[in-house]
Amino acid sequence: MTIIFQFALIGLVLLSFVLVVGVPVAYATPQNWVESKKLLWVGSAVWIALVFLVGLLNFFVV
């Protein structure tokens, strides 16, 4: 269970870094807004799911 928690936490941290860089870039480039909008929604949904998963796994690990 600890390994799954660590992978989920690493995934959350990496996705957070990607979103911190990607969201301002997506808002700054209006040419690809239609494609960027879908990626932002998917990235945000995955990020929220990972937050809940890490919270749930933290309950079982600690």
Curated annotation (Swiss-Prot):
Compartment(s): Cellular thylakoid membrane
InterPro entries, per database record: PSII_PsbZ (IPR002644), PSII_PsbZ_sf (IPR036512)
Membrane topology qualifier: Multi-pass membrane protein
Pfam family name, one: Ycf9
Keywords: Membrane, Photosynthesis, Photosystem II, Reaction center, Thylakoid, Transmembrane, Transmembrane helix
GO cellular component, one term: photosystem II reaction center
Single biological process term from Gene Ontology: photosynthesis
Statement: the UniProt record of this protein carries the keyword Endoplasmic reticulum: no
Disulfide feature: none
Thylakoid recorded as keyword: yes
Membrane-spanning segments: 8-28, 41-61
Job description of the protein: May control the interaction of photosystem II (PSII) cores with the light-harvesting antenna, regulates electron flow through the 2 photosystem reaction centers. PSII is a light-driven water plastoquinone oxidoreductase, using light energy to abstract electrons from H(2)O, generating a proton gradient subsequently used for ATP formation.
Family: Belongs to the PsbZ family.
Record's subunit section: PSII is composed of 1 copy each of membrane proteins PsbA, PsbB, PsbC, PsbD, PsbE, PsbF, PsbH, PsbI, PsbJ, PsbK, PsbL, PsbM, PsbT, PsbX, PsbY, PsbZ, Psb30/Ycf12, peripheral proteins PsbO, CyanoQ (PsbQ), PsbU, PsbV and a large number of cofactors. It forms dimeric complexes.
Protein name: Photosystem II reaction center protein Z
Gene name, Swiss-Prot/TrEMBL: psbZ
